[in-house]
Amino acid sequence: MMADTSLEAYDPDSMATLRHRVYETIKDCPVLSNRDLARILGREPSTISGRTNELCDLGLIRAWDTKKDPTTGKKVKIWEAVA
């Protein structure tokens, strides 16, 4: 069997690694918005929203509720792990 030589195998900030970190964080703390996740993981909210959309498409998380963000005043999704 050959070793994985892809960039993601060596890059701790790869999209696959970040997607996994987002999923694990949502499993541990289910009442989180993308902004909350970004703050916890030290990332930009735009990088988190892409990963949550991917996880939602995969059926691993779902929007549990919405709340009003105190900073922006916008309605935001609150995520929960499905599996």
Model-predicted regions and their roles:
Residues 1-25:
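Short alpha-helical segments that sit at the start of domains
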Residues 34-41:
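A short acidic, leucine-rich amphipathic alpha-helix
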Residues 43-57, 68:
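Short amphipathic alpha-helical interaction segments
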Residues 12, 62-83:
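Short, cationic-aromatic polyanion-contact patches
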